[in-house]
């Protein structure tokens, strides 16, 4: 009863959780209610497409997680969606989606999505970088603006591992992401993220 006029005026309900993005579409998660409600999770990406971003929370609620990037058998894999912002007064920010896995012969995996901002807790964790191609291709870097850095992607037979995401600034501060493993035959491991 209270949601209908608020939805009509502001395009967002007063109370309630946002809808999740449908899997395989890369659709963004819906925003949570202005007062109470968590953001919906982003939908995973179709093959080679980016995952959807997580929806933002209102005053109280958690941000939605970013959707995973779509894996690809040829060409580049999709990046993970960004996590949604946490509640302005109370709530946890959403984690970034993992980058898609590349099954091609010479392409990199998808980048991990960034963790959501804000909330009463630390910002959301960055997504893990996608793994590189089976023969050639570097792993993508993990990302984060706050919270824990995402791990770097793993390379294939030849290629460097992705660098880990940097630790986010906050109280307490986030942890750095681990570097991805280099190629099985040739390639360097990725660097650990910075504090």
Curated annotation (Swiss-Prot):
Q: Per the record, what is one GO cellular component?
A: extracellular region
Q: Which gene encodes it?
A: PE_PGRS61
The impact of changing residue 168 to S is: Decreases Ca(2+) binding affinity
Subunit composition and interactions: Interacts with human TLR2.
Record's subcellular location: Secreted, Cell wall; Cell surface
Recorded protein name is: PE-PGRS family protein PE_PGRS61
What InterPro entries does this protein's entry cite?
PGRS_rpt
Activity control, as annotated, is:
Binding of Ca(2+) to PE_PGRS61 induces conformational changes and increases affinity for TLR2.
Which sequence ranges are marked TM in the entry?
none
Q: Which residues pair up as cystines?
A: none
User: Which family does the similarity line name?
Assistant: Belongs to the mycobacterial PE family. PGRS subfamily.
Question: What function does this protein fulfil?
Answer: Mediates Ca(2+)-dependent up-regulation of the anti-inflammatory cytokine IL-10.
Give the signal peptide as a residue range, or say none if absent: none
Provide this UniProt record's keywords sorted from A to Z: Calcium, Cell wall, Secreted
């Amino acid at each position: 009863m209270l949601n209908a006029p608020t939805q009509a005026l502001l395009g967002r309900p007063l109370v309630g959780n946002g809808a999740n993005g449908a899997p395989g579409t890369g659709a963004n998660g819906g925003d949570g209610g202005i007062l109470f409600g968590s953001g919906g999770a982003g939908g995973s990406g179709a093959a080679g497409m980016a995952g959807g971003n997580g929806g933002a929370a209102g005053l109280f609620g958690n941000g939605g997680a970013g959707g995973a990037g779509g894996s690809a058998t040829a060409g580049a894999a999709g990046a993970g969606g960004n996590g949604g912002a946490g509640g302005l007064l109370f709530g946890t920010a959403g984690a970034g989606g993992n980058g898609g896995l590349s099954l091609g012969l010479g392409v990199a995996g998808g980048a991990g999505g960034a963790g959501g901002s804000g909330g009463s807790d630390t910002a959301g964790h960055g997504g893990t970088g996608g793994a590189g191609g089976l023969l050639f291709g570097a792993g993508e870097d993990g990302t984060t603006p706050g919270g824990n850095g995402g791990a770097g992607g793993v390379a294939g037979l030849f290629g460097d591992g992705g660098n880990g995401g940097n630790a986010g600034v906050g109280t307490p501060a986030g942890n750095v992401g681990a570097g991805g493993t280099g190629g099985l035959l040739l390639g360097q491991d990725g660097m650990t993220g910075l504090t």
